[in-house]
Amino acid sequence: VLPLVYKILRSNTEIKQAVGEAIYRHGIAPLDAPRPYITWFLVSGRPEQQLSGTPCADFDLVQIDVWSEDDAEVERLARLVRDTCEAEGLAVRIAVNGYEPETKLFRLGLEVDFIRSR
């Protein structure tokens, strides 16, 4: 089962106002995507191991990237993403922070740990 990234991010009205429907899976946005936008992808997923029986939970590592033409806006949106995920009890850390010369967009990427009971 895929993590509930879209649902969690859309629960924050400020994120919703900033990006609208522009939250894209697989880490890829359309070339004509409105800016700013958010992409996300599953880095890895594994069951939580235990000594006996089937796993009781799944651990998914997801990267969520915020993209914008404005550096300050990227930081503001990344803070909103971080705060929204942390409010759901998810661990968040910065994975990448930079500028993409090909797209002329700033990018701030967050790694988020989704641990879900089965």
Each model region followed by its residue ranges:
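Glycine-rich loops and low-complexity Gly/Arg-rich segments
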Residues: 48-50, 63-67, 88-91, 118
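Short, low-complexity, polar/charged sequence segments that are solvent-exposed and flexible
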Residues: 42-45, 57-61, 83-87, 112-113
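Oligomerization/assembly interface segments of phage tail-like spikes and tubes
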Residues: 56-69, 106-116
